[in-house]
Amino acid sequence: MKKILITFFTVLFCLTSSVGWSLTKDDLVRRDDLYYKKFSDIQFTGKITGQFQGSFKNGKEDGSWIGYHKTGQLFYKWKYKDWLEDGSWVSYWMNGQLQYKGNYKNGKKEGSWVDYNKDGTIKRELTGTFKNDEKISD
C-alpha cells in the first residue's frame, strides 16, 4: 500500500509541475495606467499569451508585442521600452495588407511613417518631426 501511495503522489507531482499557467490580457486589469493580475495589488511582471502576446515589467508593457485579429491574422508588431513606444511599429489590415508602418523613439514618432489603404496602396507617407502624431517639420 505504501508503494502505491508513493507512486501515486510521484505521478501527481510530475503531472502538476509540468503544467504551466499561461495568462492572457483578459487576466489583467488596468488601474492608474498600470496593469495588475486580477484580484491583486501587485503590479504585474511576466508574459502573456493569446490574442495579444508580450511582456510586462512592473505593470508596464515592455519589449516586443504581437497582436492577432480574432480571425488569427497578424494584427500588429511593435515594441515598448519602459512603457513608451520605442522601435519599429507595424500594423496590418484583417486581409493581411499593411495598414501602417513607422518608428517610435521614447514614445514619439520618428522618421518615416507610411499609411496604407486596404488594397495595399499607399494612402500617405510622412517623414520628419512629429508632435501629437502630426508632422511639424522635415
Describe the predicted segments one by one.
Residues 4-16:
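Sec-dependent N-terminal signal peptides
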Residues 14-138:
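Glycine/tyrosine- and acidic-biased, solvent-exposed loop/turn segments at the edges of beta-strands
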